[in-house]
Amino acid sequence: MKIRISLNILAKFLDSFAHLLFLKNKEIYTPRKEQAACVEVLERYFQANPENGRFLMNCKMRFGKCFTLYSYAQKNNINKILILTFVPAVEESLKDDLNHIEKNYKFYTDDDLQKSNFDLKNQNEPYVVFLSLQNVLGKQRIDGAKTDFDKERISKLQEIDFDLIVFDEYHYGANKKRTQIKVEKVNKKIDNPEQQDNQDDAEEELASTFKLKDIKSKFQFSYKQLVCLSGTPFSSLRNNEFSSKDQVFTYSYFDEQKAKSAENHPLKLGQYGIFPEMNIYCFELAEIFTAQEQEIFITPGKGKNKLPEISFRKLFQTENVSKESSKPVYRFVNENLVEKLIDSLIDKRKGFSHTPLSWENIDKHKHSLLILPTRVACFALANLLKNHWYFENNDFQIINMSESQFGNGKKALIELNKHLDEAKKTNKNTLTITVAKLTIGITVKEWSTVFFLKDLKGAESYFQTIFRIQTPYIKNCKNLKEICYVYDFNMYRCLEVTNEYSKQTQTDPKFSASWFQNLDKFLPIYLVRGDEIQKTDPEILQKYEYFIMDKRAFSTRWMDESNIIDIDVLCNVGQDEDAQKILKKILAHKKFKSSKKKREFEDVHLEKSPKSEAFSEGVRSGKDYAAEQGNVLEELENFWNFNQALEQKAKAEFQQKNFDDNEWNNYKKGFNFGVNKHFEDKVSIKKIVQNKIKDFKKRKGRTTSTFKKWKWLYFWWE
């Protein structure tokens, strides 16, 4: 006896069977404390704003924003969820997050909406509908008009009263214009890589479609609650799009790293131990290129506050050297400069003491991402590296994501993972070259390093890109990525976007000095300048904030060779105003160079000041004390204890005099002046310091801490 089953019934049976397998393979997660806190904030906000409320989750990449949102939906009996995104490649990760909550949600995509027999209104089980905004806008275009299919798709969504609409990667769309044009650019198939450069720009800046208030007027979707997800919603925050504090939950990279530091599990990986620490290295390109070579891609700053402009588009400018127009072959116009840059990252003898791609360091950077300004530059660099002796002989696989086989979105991610899997089987290193593809919202756990060689100034895109490498990578219970690395070749850009990120992700309304301490501890920034590496410390970062309107002064101070000193020394001196004053006086500060000025200065205090007697006595005591100390050179070498001795000696002498306590400052000034006067009369301090520097250069090299100390003394003398 034969039993006939209709195709529709069979399809439903297979769908139910697949769903049962899905439920069996679930691995339920317990929300971390910050995720649970976010759920509570969401509950409070939407209880106070039950209709058409809107909320922003300003949480770092890898926070688990969608899992947190699913946890909130499960707890509050939210059954009809629509997720809209500009990054179709995140589909799998959003679907996978449903595996980690107890409630069973169906997951529908655009493929389901295309089925003629699919009716979302008749779905009784809780569900999540995932759509890219490109699809909602309509990617099948005829002269810019929506097709009947597009209208039908949108009409299906308009029939539903959604409990919750979610905008994923919302930074893409915060109040941007010309979106429709950009969407059409992205969806248009282009075979010519030179024309594709414009498409990449459109894809990177593709910004959602509208302001939140325009949702109903544009799509006429009905919803009770709306949540925007982003790790970098800086434009929205600057524009006060979410004006109430109750509308925003913030969790930053610094919050995560502080939790990791407090966890302190020496023998096992804790909840936060899996998240890599990020280190940023800024390479000073002027160290490896001649002045003539720099003119090609570096424009000197003009005016008081102007910085040099670095153009990576000019550095990586290309030309087509193929005689066949149908088969273009690209190479760099300034190929010798590009080769010089690549060689400097491989061989210490070619410019930089830190060489991330050298054989001894490559294990830290086994799978790297390299960001370039144009698609044609990607083709030119891929060709160059494949014929480079180092990459040819050391088992490197060069992956050019601008090749047509990668496509866009989900297809590109699948193709990339295929290449990475092949490389891992043969233990090869990989270098993935791209302009913007797969730099937003996606997860590639193998990437541990990013080289930033692109003209990009926005903090949103910059941090979205570099946080691709901060994805945890655990294999066989072993943490394969404890630290991840960012290599930037534009110091000014790096400091500016880092400053912006720090401001926009802090929860304390006051941008305090302690925040700079967090930046220094959890996101260290190093300047690589020839054979020296200098770590920025909190004081330098504060100086950057101070010099934000006068960056020329800051960049000169940071890059000055004389500023390469021990961090503890800089912090100690920088935090003590009296120490700075004493230091300047001991080193014959220019204020005291002219004997005439010195006499005038002394006369002013001795004759016109109402406390001149205390000052005069201090001068005499200071001279006597300096004379007792003997060799001035020994005093300079022991200066770091000497300034404290000055303070103690002056205090002891003052207490023996018959002065009022309120005259202490005048006495101390006079004492310091007397010490300085004795040293100036006794010896040329500038000559001592110069000779000492020359001696260290000849005998002990430029890297000893003592040499750096003398360089710094000379810096202050000047």
From Swiss-Prot:
Pfam families: ResIII
Role summary: Corresponds to the C-terminus of a putative G subtype type II restriction/methylase subunit.
Protein name: Putative type II restriction enzyme and methyltransferase RM.MpnORF110P C-terminus
Cross-referenced InterPro entries: Helicase/UvrB_N, P-loop_NTPase
Biological source species: Mycoplasma pneumoniae (strain ATCC 29342 / M129 / Subtype 1) (Mycoplasmoides pneumoniae)
Single GO molecular function: hydrolase activity
SUPFAM superfamilies assigned to the protein according to its UniProt record, in alphabetical order: P-loop containing nucleoside triphosphate hydrolases
